[in-house]
Amino acid sequence: MAKVIFLENCTFLIPTKIDSEDRKVNLTLVVDYLLKHFKTNIIIAEQDTESKVKSFFKWGSKVKHIFVPSTNDFFHKTRLLNIMIKAATTDVVVSYDSDIILPLNQYLDAFALLNSKQIHFAYPFNSRVYHIEKAQRGLFEKNLSLDDVGSHTTMKHPGVPPGGVLFMNKAEFAKCGYENENFKSWGAEDIERTVRIEKMGYAVARMNGLIFHLEHDRTPHSTDVNPHYKENENEFKKTVAMSKEEIENYIRSWRF
């Protein structure tokens, strides 16, 4: 039996909308992986007209499921994250995409850093994304171990991603306004958050290690052709141009 790692003062926040079979499979794999290896807290917030997660939810009291009814055609990730952050009762919260897997030591190292109060925000990786293609997903699923994936990955995108997984001190993130719900669908919400946190005077650590992505089909709302992409870019540019004082005033104007 695998050794369980205790991360009890930590809550993983997983926003989702099940718009394909891939999303269902990947969410299940991610939650199974976290529960196999960690004694921790997990919240899933699901946006949809009717819950699809309920039909395959198998984790009982180990996972909290929040259903957020919505007729919006876009995925409002930032709103779901804010709902989960406010529901979390731990000092450390983790913004966690529903298709990301990390080597185990990276979770532990990031949590230890935040739990020590040395730093309040940390990305637990510093590599380009390694993609686990759908055809290779079964290799991971068999034992829920990255050791089984080995070289069966691809690298498609240059640079280190600005999102995926971010460990955060909940109280300090509150001072930064939490998530910016002006972002809708996909585009720039992760990098805006990092820029805003840094402009508020905090360091955002990048820790050594890899990041793996479970591949999936994409709807137009998961790409830069979504109708909100330009507005998202403008929202990001607004944050980039602001001073700390201007950001503080802007946060006070938010009504979400």
What are the residue ranges of the model-derived segments?
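Active-site acidic short loop of glycosyltransferases
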Residues: 88-91, 178
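Glycine-rich, basic loop-to-helix element that forms the pyrophosphate-binding segment
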Residues: 71-87
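Conserved catalytic core of nucleotide-sugar-dependent glycosyltransferases
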Residues: 103-181
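Conserved glycosyltransferase catalytic-site signature
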Residues: 77-82, 99-100, 107, 161-165, ...
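N-proximal low-complexity "stem/linker" segments adjacent to membrane-targeting elements
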Residues: 1-32
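Short beta-strand-to-loop acidic/aromatic patch adjacent to the donor-nucleotide binding site
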Residues: 90-103
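C-terminal catalytic/acceptor-binding lobe
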Residues: 5, 22-26, 160, 181-256
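Acidic donor-binding segment of Leloir-type glycosyltransferases
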Residues: 31-69
